[in-house]
């Protein structure tokens, strides 16, 4: 794994792994996201598996885990999916702010940076 190679080359490496996320944009779905909405059960099933894999890797390698999926689930209570994502996968500026705040919260809590 790339993680093993990286850790071998740098024993002081601190890993931060971000949880994958996906949005189901049903209003005016952009062309890039239409296959995701059309095949939502497949995409969402794969996402669930990948979320678990990333969490397991974070646990195995003592990495900081950033729960992006969870943070976006909270954000969806405030605004619809198209506010957070442009095409079901890529974040908007508002989505990037959610991600940045989540990342900072997690790495600060882990002691990687000072408050």
Predicted regions span which residues?
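Alpha-helical cap/lid subdomain in secreted, periplasmic
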Residues: 1-115
């Amino acid at each position: 794994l790339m993680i093993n190679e990286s850790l071998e080359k740098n024993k002081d490496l601190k890993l931060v792994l971000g949880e994958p996320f996906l949005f189901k944009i049903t209003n005016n779905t952009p062309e890039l996201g239409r296959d995701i909405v059309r095949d939502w059960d497949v995409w969402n099933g794969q996402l669930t598996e990948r979320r678990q894999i990333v969490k397991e890797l974070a646990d195995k390698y003592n990495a900081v885990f950033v729960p992006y999926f969870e943070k976006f689930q909270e954000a969806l209570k405030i605004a619809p999916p198209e506010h957070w994502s442009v095409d079901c996968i890529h974040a908007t500026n508002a989505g990037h702010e959610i991600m940045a705040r989540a990342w900072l919260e997690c790495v600060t809590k882990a002691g990687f940076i000072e408050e």
